[in-house]
Amino acid sequence: MSNGYEDHMAEDCRDDIGRTNLIVNYLPQNMTQEELRSLFSSIGEVESAKLIRDKVAGHSLGYGFVNYVTAKDAERAISTLNGLRLQSKTIKVSYARPSSEVIKDANLYISGLPRTMTQKDVEDMFSRFGRIINSRVLVDQTTGLSRGVAFIRFDKRSEAEEAITSFNGHKPPGSSEPITVKFAANPNQNKNMALLSQLYHSPARRFGGPVHHQAQRFRFSPMGVDHMSGISGVNVPGNASSGWCIFIYNLGQDADEGILWQMFGPFGAVTNVKVIRDFNTNKCKGFGFVTMTNYEEAAMAIASLNGYRLGDKILQVSFKTNKSHK
């Protein structure tokens, strides 16, 4: 099972044969389908616009598809609207790709990179293997330097395989240690769950402000007993159509949704936040939930924020299991 928008691409884009169909990522959660159509109609005639929503709850998942009548208008929409700032989001506009086995599982996890390498450096290094759909270098928010970890999604799995064969164990210029290049984890495959543990144990200062680092002994492992007891698949983190749900425990009474947006937003696309409140006092009961569209971004948010201090509270952050928290 793929994560993010690729599941929907199978049903929404399978008949697309031209370059008129676009996918729009990182939309504001309160943006409507009509507003999506209106925005893209300013470029040219839109044949269809579809905002993808949670099939049960009905809320926006933060992305949609726009199909133009002409390929020229679609190309102009990408050059005009890609990177547009909408509310607190910067939208990404690109061609939608029909789902097929050829393009599945083409996402790489790279670690051990020199801290001086930028996103452009990483793309330049890997572009010889094929077309890069997107890339992300994880940056320490305090120092502004790379954390030596990156994700790259190729157009085809064969391109990703070639990159692994050529670069796994390779020493890039400026590095005294070999880098690790492998397929990014699919959390529905137990053999790949070690990635979360790797992310969790890595240096994890990602969020500035009132969050302060705590000693490792205070950290609550997202791979703890409650999660590992479900290794058969019952309680391991899995993604429903709504994305990857993260459980945050030990929030202060005054915590609100704005704090969660501020904390998790820097890691990637957040589609929903919820603080659980006491019915009588309307104060936070100490926990909340955040839903993110991308597994790697959710895993990194957990690795960075679990065990950190918010106010006078030490947060416990983990993937939500199938067990209900009351």
From Swiss-Prot:
GO cellular component: cytoplasm; cytoplasmic stress granule; cytoplasmic vesicle; cytosol; endoplasmic reticulum; glutamatergic synapse; nucleoplasm; nucleus
PTM statement from Swiss-Prot or TrEMBL: Phosphorylated by MAPKAPK2. Phosphorylated by PRKCD. Methylated at Arg-217 by CARM1 in macrophages in response to LPS challenge.
Organism of derivation: Rattus norvegicus
NCBIfam families assigned to the protein according to its UniProt record, in alphabetical order: ELAV_HUD_SF
Localization terms from the record: Cytoplasm; Nucleus; Cytoplasm, Stress granule; Cytoplasm, P-body
Source organism, top-level taxon: Eukaryota
Biological role: RNA-binding protein that binds to the 3'-UTR region of mRNAs and increases their stability. Involved in embryonic stem cell (ESC) differentiation: preferentially binds mRNAs that are not methylated by N6-methyladenosine (m6A), stabilizing them, promoting ESC differentiation. Has also been shown to be capable of binding to m6A-containing mRNAs and contributes to MYC stability by binding to m6A-containing MYC mRNAs. Binds to poly-U elements and AU-rich elements (AREs) in the 3'-UTR of target mRNAs. Binds avidly to the AU-rich element in FOS and IL3/interleukin-3 mRNAs.
Protein name: ELAV-like protein 1
Cross-link type Glycyl lysine isopeptide (Lys-Gly) (interchain with G-Cter in SUMO2), residue numbers: 191
Subunit record text: Monomer and homodimer (in vitro). Interacts with ANP32A. Interacts with ZNF385A; the interaction is indirect and mRNA-dependent and may regulate p53/TP53 expression. Identified in a mRNP complex, at least composed of DHX9, DDX3X, ELAVL1, HNRNPU, IGF2BP1, ILF3, PABPC1, PCBP2, PTBP2, STAU1, STAU2, SYNCRIP and YBX1. Interacts with AGO1 and AGO2. Interacts with IGF2BP1. Interacts with IGF2BP2 and IGF2BP3. Interacts with HNRNPL. Interacts with DHX36; this interaction occurs in a RNA-dependent manner. Interacts with ILF3; this interaction occurs in a RNA-dependent manner. Interacts with PLEKHN1.
Tagged with keyword Metal-binding: no
Lineage, top ranks: Eukaryota, Metazoa, Chordata, Craniata, Vertebrata
Ranges where the RRM domain occurs: 20-98, 106-186, 244-322
PROSITE patterns xrefs: RRM (PS50102)
PANTHER family, per the entry: EUKARYOTIC TRANSLATION INITIATION FACTOR 3 SUBUNIT G
SUPFAM superfamilies per record: RNA-binding domain, RBD
